[in-house]
Amino acid sequence: IRAEVGMVFQQFNLFPHLSILDNCTLAPIWVKKLPKKKAEEIAMQNLERVQIVDQAKKFPGQLSGGQQQRCALARALCMEPKIMLFDEPTSALDPEMIKEVLDAMVDLAKAGMTMIVVTHEMGFAKEVADNMIFMDEGKIIEKAKTKDFFANPKSDRTKLFLSQIL
């Protein structure tokens, strides 16, 4: 199942000495044994998908935080996962960069990608999530359909949280 799951972390975890294109082709070539040309084709498609294809020849240090996170997303997509896991993908970004990354994730959701997202971005979650799990101190406090979670929270802790952020 690991081969069918892509991950995007809080930190971008890009190889600083490799170009954006090489960051995206490394795993498909080494893990999936794809020919370099095919891996580059897939990488360019995914860089286009997250709107940074024009950055392919640059190195991570030459990109903004939002561009680096979108590169990390493209890199994960190059493995053609069925499920994407996101661990606070916007937490290391400046506010103006957050929208860039969330827009790319919204596009994935609209394309039908199954995503499990750890986030504090409730507007984003409300827009794209089918189901919500609210956790506090590592414990599940509430599970609900997104509409019910926001419209009719059950636990006092969830109500308090929503009253503070909405």
Language-model-detected regions and their locations in the chain:
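C-terminal boundary and immediately downstream tail of ABC-type ATPase nucleotide-binding domains
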Residues: 143, 147-166
